[in-house]
Amino acid sequence: MAVTTALVKELRERTGAGMMDCKKALTETDGDIELAIENMRKSGAAKAAKKAGNIAAEGAIIIKKNGNVAVLVEVNCQTDFVAKDVSFLAFADKVAEAAIADTVTIEDLQAKFEEARVELVTKIGENINVRRLQYITGENLVEYRHGDRIGVVVAGVADEETLKHVAMHVAASSPEYLTPSDVPADVVAKEQQVQIEIAMNEGKSAEIAEKMVVGRMKKFTGEVSLTGQAFIMEPKKTVGEILKEKNATVTSFVRVEVGEGIERKEEDFAAEVAAQIAAAKAK
């Protein structure tokens, strides 16, 4: 059967693959579109395996809520260009919908969407990864997203505006703990030892150094905890003081940022272009 423009168009619409890939697949199957789709799916798995080693540190954070439960899901890709792609964002949204529909582990979620992920890798040409999810429960849940890169959900007893402002603060200031007393003892002990050594290196005696460290440790636990941080909208007051004034309470929060903890490979622009040209020639 002749490979017509109409056949190529139909295959593109059904698979989302590029025009040349569709034409090649149809040529190899003498115009058998069903066989072409089957072969493309098989080769897609192979392509996805090759892409698996590529660092995927861009992407999007999707937040979904259902009653007193919310979930934040991170789906990664390799470039910020693909992170804005309609197909990529639609895939990420479906993953998040599945996560809020039923409490699942990240392994279950990855397995559920593996076939769709492979198809998307084939279509887009980048490594795609369903990386992590995090649930949060609370009486009142308020979300805030800074673009698609940072997602925050705050749980508490307060009006929505107050919780929204706190969520914005969490996005900007990245607190690690809820209150100063929540900072783990081992973290406090480690920082305390560092501060004592700093003071002694400044020429202070051990006795004086230990007294100086008391104030420094109070500052440290405040800086790493939500209620101890200076409120971004009113820096002369802490978040804790603002909450007290409003007779409000924050019980928990979750902050997720795209690419956290992923080691990114640094390449200069010339090297990146050269790599793309080499990849194009290899096809």
Curated annotation (Swiss-Prot):
Keywords: Cytoplasm, Elongation factor, Protein biosynthesis. The keyword Lipid biosynthesis does not apply. One of its GO terms (molecular function) is translation elongation factor activity. One of its GO terms (cellular component) is cytoplasm. It comes from the Bacteria. Associates with the EF-Tu.GDP complex and induces the exchange of GDP to GTP. It remains bound to the aminoacyl-tRNA.EF-Tu.GTP complex up to the GTP hydrolysis stage on the ribosome. This is Elongation factor Ts. It comes from Pseudoalteromonas translucida (strain TAC 125).
